[in-house]
Amino acid sequence: MNRTALYAGSFDPVTNGHVDVIRQACRLVPRLVIAIGVHPGKTPLFGAEERAELLREICAPLAAAEGAALDVVTFDDLAVSAARRVGASLFIRGLRDGTDLDYEMQLAGMNGAMAPEVQTVFLPASTGVRPITATLVRQIAAMGGDVRPFVPDLVAERLRARFAKP
């Protein structure tokens, strides 16, 4: 039985919430593929390659500690297409609250209609990371706030450098 899981997102930036979901997923599957969505209409704070580099550096040790293989890829089409390309049989989705659940249930239904062979697995966020969103992290960083409680140290350094006043 194939137990490769795909965790798709923008990861702009990588947050402690993302890392929490990745850690949980690595405990469940022997192989996790983190898929960074690239959308031509959006201008991300960090480019896709930089986000991939950050994810590899931050998450490879976590995956290794759990005995899971970790790959990081980019995609610019449907997540179901990315899942098929990497041979995933599971979608991993993190849930912070009921609002996330409502949205994620719709997404799971649509993905299930397009790719019934790929099952969605919801992982509840750990209590300490539930309020974290990448959008809020970007806003705090842009206004000179301290994002260290919300992101890995490497990401905090990159955000500080990105928003440094000349």
UniProtKB/Swiss-Prot annotation:
SUPFAM superfamilies in UniProt: Nucleotidylyl transferase
Any GO MF annotation of the entry: pantetheine-phosphate adenylyltransferase activity
Cofactor section: Mg(2+)
A single GO cellular-component term on record: cytoplasm
Catalysed transformations (reactions): (R)-4'-phosphopantetheine + ATP + H(+) = 3'-dephospho-CoA + diphosphate
Pathways involved: Cofactor biosynthesis; coenzyme A biosynthesis; CoA from (R)-pantothenate: step 4/5
Keywords tagged on the record: ATP-binding, Coenzyme A biosynthesis, Cytoplasm, Magnesium, Nucleotide-binding, Nucleotidyltransferase, Transferase
CDD domains: PPAT (cd02163)
GO BP term (any one): coenzyme A biosynthetic process
Residues reported to bind substrate: 10, 42, 79, 93
The family this protein is said to belong to: Belongs to the bacterial CoaD family.
HAMAP family cross-referenced by the UniProt entry: PPAT_bact
Functional note: Reversibly transfers an adenylyl group from ATP to 4'-phosphopantetheine, yielding dephospho-CoA (dPCoA) and pyrophosphate.
NCBIfam families hit by this protein: coaD_prev_kdtB, cyt_tran_rel
Protein name as catalogued: Phosphopantetheine adenylyltransferase
Native source species: Methylobacterium sp. (strain 4-46)
The gene coding this protein: coaD
